[in-house]
Amino acid sequence: GIKDYLKKLLQKAINKIKSLRKKQDA
């Protein structure tokens, strides 16, 4: 449903932020 879709979008956004932070730290 919509809730599952929103959860997937949130996870994608979180993963992007985490990867960006890792690149900055490196």
Curated annotation (Swiss-Prot):
The keyword Aminoacyl-tRNA synthetase does not apply. The keyword Secreted applies. May have cytolytic and antimicrobial activity. It comes from the Eukaryota. The lineage of its organism: Eukaryota, Metazoa, Ecdysozoa, Arthropoda, Chelicerata. GO terms for biological process: killing of cells of another organism. GO terms for molecular function: toxin activity. It is found in: Secreted. It comes from Oxyopes takobius. Expressed by the venom gland. Keywords: Antimicrobial, Cytolysis, Secreted, Toxin. This is Oxyopinin-3a. One of its GO terms (cellular component) is extracellular region.
